[in-house]
UniProtKB/Swiss-Prot annotation:
Coiled coil: none annotated. It is a single-pass membrane protein. GO terms for cellular component: membrane. This is Uncharacterized protein R853. The keyword Transmembrane applies. It comes from the Viruses. The chain crosses the membrane at residues 103-125. It is found in: Membrane.
């Protein structure tokens, strides 16, 4: 589970890292949602926008997971028939573009990458760097 902020020095600072438990069914999104709302209702210090951001990320995670689960085959199709391969630098994290290299190394080192990194990749592949 992720929050919007990124701290390159501490990859877990703004991340609850509960996706493995959610993925394996040890906890459910409903359980997490209930716990977050319950904690917020009992707290005098939790900020509404932080709780909202956390819940929004939980909903986005479930939406993305649903897409992958139900339309994965369509998502994996080569709709435009592209034949070009991406270069090795995208697998090694040596693109020379610091945010991209950090995203790639983070994915390899910690097994996770935030949605912010996802949007960086979308932008870069859209402009065809």
């Amino acid at each position: 589970m992720y929050e919007d902020a990124i701290d390159f020095d501490d990859p877990y600072l703004f991340h609850s890292v509960i996706s493995p438990q959610l993925n394996s069914g040890l906890i459910t999104p409903r359980y997490v949602l209930d716990k977050v709302i319950d904690k917020y209702n009992k707290s005098n210090t939790d900020l509404l926008y932080e709780v909202e951001g956390y819940i929004r990320q939980l909903v986005w995670r479930e939406y993305s997971r649903m897409l992958y689960r139900y339309i994965r085959k369509d998502m994996m199709k080569n709709y435009f028939g592209n034949k070009n391969r991406i270069s090795e630098i995208w697998y090694t994290g040596n693109t020379g573009i610091e945010p991209v290299d950090l995203a790639i190394s983070s994915a390899f080192q910690y097994g996770l990458s935030t949605s912010n990194f996802f949007f960086i990749f979308l932008y870069i592949f859209t402009i065809k760097i």
